[in-house]
């Protein structure tokens, strides 16, 4: 897998589940892009790696840190240079055809990325859903998460992270996204919760379990 994950979401988690299932007992790698800007890529490379490992602990050891890998082509070169002769890439359903065409175009050909030559070419498998890095309003996309962070809506932001990450780390992630977007950090995380005087949600809030996702 090669992804932006800026920020990571439960959609990325589903993609990684498919990756692990597809790999079976074979090794698999997760590469993250290193692009960073204050519009669509607010998180730094190091922050993405850190938070992805917290969000997806099952796959933490497979999340690779390699400053030389900045594109899918770089990732394939690194995998080929490690001795692998065959490779399967897992991607969102809307990216499968694009990856099949572009990545196989350079199979066996040298380029700026280096060289890779996999037997049977690069096989690209659909994760069964659209690319969680895609822009738009479909599903729990990274673009929606950036919007929640911009609005300071921690409730919806946290819902898009899943259950593995702690409340404290979820808050740090939202503030890291805000900072990368050029916004001030926020401490008023619970302003979006409207509680009735007596309710189960109020008791969860008081006991500190409401945001234990």
Q: Residue spans of the language-model regions?
A:
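Nucleotidyltransferase catalytic core that binds NTPs
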Residues: 1-209
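Short beta-strand-centered aromatic/proline hotspots
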Residues: 213
